[in-house]
Each structure stands twice: as structure tokens, then as C-alpha cells.
């Protein structure tokens, strides 16, 4: 019988990246569920009901130590996907440094659990730089003495999310698309609300500590099928021409050219689609029951 975790003292739950796509929704879910939360971001925001805001820089251990003081459970949602071309070129090093800094600060502050949202790919072939970095971050966080729950998610779909923005702009703006072979990769897209359900569920179930859990939605489809589904909802015809030699790097520049999604953000999104990302291990679904949304609802 798993132990249901409850909050032991006010504001002892930390959400890092609290101003981001996932972080904002996680904050709302936690507070709606009756928890009081400490929200960490690079910029300072005013406190709100049941949310205490703290400002910290993931490259400054001292600020992280202050942010994690008194924290029992920390949600790790930090990444280095956006930024300048120079920052993109160094993203793996930056993500490694962030994770090492956070682990040191969390250890010094006596944090009891870390819950990390990573990416799901079916390993076998060589991972892209982006997905390798996401897995490496999980290993760094788990290398200490704090139990880590790593949730590896397939493509996350929801308003404000990078994958959704790329999908929406491509389908809405272009009558036809020239696409590389990665549009045929199998994915198990998951609604952002369900990702948040899994994050909160992992926190509540103590038996998830120390485990890597794969999460995805109820539908398995290619990214091309996902684009066609969205176009059908808009009642639009979508013509796709596949070009096998179009590399992820060239794809990201093309997306930058035809949509508002910057190449620095498009590149990791495309990289995450190069590999199949389908749930093979159902342990996460068994340990954290979630009512999953079909893509027709999530889009």
C-alpha cells in the first residue's frame, strides 16, 4: 500500500521554472488542490494567495540555496532550450551546470525529494544532443542522496507550449509543407493538463521516489498525423511533401523562417521528434492513475 504524501508545513513545496509553460499550470493545480507553494523564477514576482515567490538564478548556487531553504519537495522544471545562438550551442553544458548547482543547493538545504520532468525517447539509436542532455540532467539529479522521481514525457500539447505553437503555426499558415522524415516518428502526445496531473500524483505517492516513469497520452500517432488532426479540426486541407535529406538543423531554420517560433527553440523541439517517443513501460500509469485526454480534446 503506497503512502499518500501530505504537506507537513506551509510553502515546503518548490516549483522551479514557475513562470514557464508547465510551471504556471503546476502552480495552479497545486494551489487548487489546497497546497501552499514556493515559486522560483529568474525574475521577481509579487506573492499571491498560497504562493510565495522567490527569485533565483540557476547559475548562482547561493541564490538556489536560499530558494530551497525549508523545502521538502522540489519540482525541477529548468531547461536551457531558448536563448541566443551562443547559448544554444552551449545548452548541454548549461543544463549540466544548472542541474549540478541545484543538486548541491538542495542537498545543503535538506530537500527530501526532487521530481524532474524529462523527455521520452525509445532508446536504441544514438540520442539527439537535446534528448541526451535531458537524460543526463536526470542522472545528475539522481547522483546525490536525494530520491528523484523522473517523469519522461512524450510530446506535450497545450496552449503556450513550444510543440503546440510550432504545430499551430505550421498548419494555420501553410497550404502545403515540405517535411523531413522525422514527421513519421511515432509519438504518444500528452495534454499538458495530464502532465501536471502526473507531476502532482508523483508527489502524492511516496512509492514513486527513486523511479523513472514514462508518461504519454492515450493516442499513438506520428507528428504528421498530429498535424493532419489539427488541420481537420480547422477544416483545412493539408498537403505534405516529405524530403528525407532535410536535417533537424535545416528544419529548425525553415520553421524559424515561416513561423514566429525561433530557430533556437525549434531546434530542440525538432530534435525531440527525431526519435520515437512511445511509452513502453506502463509502471507510471499503474502508480499514478490519470484520466487521459485524447488529442481531439487536447488540441
Predicted regions located by residue number:
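Mid/C-terminal beta-alpha module of Rossmann-like enzyme folds, strongest
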Residues: 2-12, 198-265, 276-299
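N-terminal Rossmann NAD(P)H-binding glycine-rich loop of SDR-like oxidoreductase domains
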Residues: 2-35
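SDR active-site strand-loop-helix element
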Residues: 16, 40, 77, 114-119, ...
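Conserved glycine-rich Rossmann-like NAD(P)H-binding loop of the short-chain dehydrogenase/reductase
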Residues: 35-42
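NAD(P)H-binding glycine-rich loop region in Rossmannoid oxidoreductase-like domains
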Residues: 45-109, 119-125
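Short-chain dehydrogenase/reductase
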Residues: 92-96, 126-138, 142, 156-157, ...
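Conserved beta-loop-beta element that borders a ligand/cofactor-binding pocket
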Residues: 118, 139-160, 166-169, 173, ...
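Substrate-positioning beta->alpha
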Residues: 133, 162-163, 182-204, 211-214
